[in-house]
Amino acid sequence: MTDKKYIIALDQGTTSSRAVLLDHNANVVEIAQREFTQIYPRAGWVEHNPMEIWATQSSTLNEVVAKSGITSDEIAAIGITNQRETTIVWEKSTGTPVYNAIVWQCRRTADITDKLKADGYEEYIRNTTGLVVDPYFSGTKVKWILDNVEGAREKAERGELLFGTVDTWLVWKLTQGRVHVTDYTNASRTMLFNIHTKQWDDKMLEILNIPRSILPEVRNSSEIYGQTNIGGKGGVRIPVAGIAGDQQAALYGHLCVHAGQAKNTYGTGCFMLLHTGNKAITSKNGLLTTIACNAKGEPEYALEGSVFIAGASIQWLRDELKIVHDSFDSEYFAQKVTDSNGVYVVPAFTGLGAPYWDPYARGAIFGLSRGANCNHIVRATLQSIAYQTRDVLEAMQSDSGERLQYLRVDGGATNNNFLMQFQADILDVNVERPVVKEVTALGAAYLAGLATGFWKDLDELRDKARVERTFSPDSDNEKRERRYKGWKKAVKRSLEWAKEDEE
């Protein structure tokens, strides 16, 4: 226990930068948030201005302190969580970025990834980095900057440039250019990192022609990396002491630190992580193998899977079908009927991800009879989110041999009690919704607080990680399996819909 009273989590996301002030009981005291510019130079290209990322993040740090009326000497530490994979390259001597940040969503390096596949590197990349070959990850973005920005490759070869994901950039700026580090969770998303040896991979650097000198040092997610002071030079020095990529930070914020523990974040899509302990499991179902934290913030492993369309399907009901006026209405309409009347909605608007991996699948509504109405369609759309979650979690359990203990949940759609209850029913496990909804920030705060002695250990945190509500599954196994069988039948009929007839 220290005489400090607060931790600040910096939550640097894809559309906004946030600072979250937490007290010793892990309660949120104050939040500051600033949105920043999304830059779309061409179709499929997405960029951010690194200086704007820093400006919005540093201003929220100042603002959260000012709004709460606390002083810098009451702050024990700062933790960082960030949008993953987004890539920044800057000059070591001036701190000036040589190009905008290339965002995780950006598809500009598809030709580079196509060549990696054509050259036969898929299996090596899969086995070494745990990732699939895709423009999503940082490695090909770094190569693009070095190949396309005038003078960048020459400067990199001379040791004059630095690369970092957003966490690295923020630590470098917070410490006035003294510290160039990342953590294992962010390193594992670069496609340059060997997740087994926990080192930068020489062969990947050679394949992508990236000089080792630009890479940050890789450290644990919970340790003191350097110090900063709020509001410019002078003043109290505050340790920067925790780093984790956003999904791994959420896993830690839920205190899922042991094998078999999982979380699902319900946003536009869903991000699911299943902790697999010290086993790096190569998925047979197209899931990613990634690094997560153990109780001490040291690297262990997780399987990661995503659902493309979750909350977005409710927006579709609102914006395109116009059968709900507000996303919050979906629960009300779903409960106006006692079941879905045999209706299934497969929201494969952009294809289907794990475990189907079919880009040609398309959305469909099945099982319509004369008695089907709008309420049945709303109910079936909500149920589709839970069914897709079961699809991914079954793939995870199949790959890992781990039986899910319970599912911790966060994200906007978790406020929908009907959806959460149906999720428990269809998975046959308890679904736990936490009191503190800022789970990603909480993970970064926990990591920083443990590194600085603000909290003693995870046992102390367990008392603070309160569950607001537990949704327990219906005991009717026959009904559960009948419903899921119907879902699988509906999905089967949606597959390959957009594929041109080969005849």
Curated annotation (Swiss-Prot):
UniProt xrefs under InterPro entries: ATPase_NBD (IPR043129), Carb_kinase_FGGY (IPR000577), Carb_kinase_FGGY_CS (IPR018483), FGGY_C (IPR018485), FGGY_N (IPR018484), Glycerol_kin (IPR005999)
Binding of ATP, residues: T14, T15, S16, T268, G311, Q315, G412
Q: Which residues bind glycerol?
A: R84, E85, Y136, D246, Q247
CDD domains, sorted: FGGY_EcGK_like
Activity regulation, short description: Inhibited by fructose 1,6-bisphosphate (FBP).
What does the record list as GO biological process? glycerol catabolic process; glycerol metabolic process; glycerol-3-phosphate metabolic process
In this chain, ADP is annotated as bound at T14, R18, T268, G311, G412, N416
Associated pathway: Polyol metabolism; glycerol degradation via glycerol kinase pathway; sn-glycerol 3-phosphate from glycerol: step 1/1
UniProt KW keywords: ATP-binding, Glycerol metabolism, Kinase, Nucleotide-binding, Transferase
> Which amino acid positions bind sn-glycerol 3-phosphate, per UniProt?
T14, R84, E85, Y136, D246
Q: What does it catalyze? A: glycerol + ATP = sn-glycerol 3-phosphate + ADP + H(+)
**GO cellular component terms?**
cytosol
EC number(s) for this protein? 2.7.1.30
Gene Ontology MF term list: ATP binding; glycerol kinase activity
The main enzyme category here is: transferase
What intrachain disulfides are recorded?
none
Does Nucleotide-binding count among this protein's keywords? yes
What is the protein's known function?
Key enzyme in the regulation of glycerol uptake and metabolism. Catalyzes the phosphorylation of glycerol to yield sn-glycerol 3-phosphate.
Q: Which family does it belong to?
A: Belongs to the FGGY kinase family.
The name under which this protein is listed is Glycerol kinase
- What organism is recorded for this protein? Haemophilus influenzae (strain PittGG)
Gene name linked to the record: glpK
